[in-house]
Amino acid sequence: GGGNNFNEKTIGEAIDGSLKRLKTDYIDLYQLHWPERSTNYFGRRDYTLDSEEGDWNSFESVLKALEKFIKSGKTRYIGMSNETPYGLSKYIELSKNKNLPRMMSVQNPYNLVNRTYEIGMSEISIREKCGLLVYYPLATGALSGKYRNGQMPKNSRQALFKGWERHLNPLAMRAYE
């Protein structure tokens, strides 16, 4: 992919790489992964503006870059992942006011124990008809029951990829039961 710098060059590299790997000439839905700007990553609460965060591409320039790939036929629709109500509202507003392509989907976490999507994203998603593509529907496998009573299946995500322990802490495990 093209990294997390959403300009025409890096988006083009990412799209072309995906087209090659998928052995196709177009992508039905191309999604941006993570906002460029600093935001509440990984469930962090209490957003604070980082005045040192550096440059990131404006929402409008991102939509203009994506528009070129829609017009060229490389992608049909666009969406994003891990976005906030602020980010989605900016994209929607610019799409309407500047006749730019609109975000059709947002891919955020949502499951029985992580329902933060309902706080702000659900309203704008429903009102603006921006579909939700859920990730972590089973809370990285914790809701499947395979980690009960301290079990750690050999080839499970938790065994293979360290750093996801926050989903298996004692308080979370009580909620899964």
Residue ranges and their predicted role:
Residues 1-12, 49-57:
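Active-site mouth loops of central-metabolism enzymes
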Residues 6-22, 59-64, 88-93:
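Short, acidic/polar
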Residues 11-26, 120-129:
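Short amphipathic alpha-helices and their capping/turn segments at secondary-structure boundaries
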Residues 29-30:
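Acidic/hydrophobic-patterned starts of short beta strands in beta-sheet-rich repeat architectures
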Residues 35-177:
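Beta/alpha (TIM)-barrel catalytic core signal, keyed to glycine-rich beta->alpha loops juxtaposed to Asp/Glu
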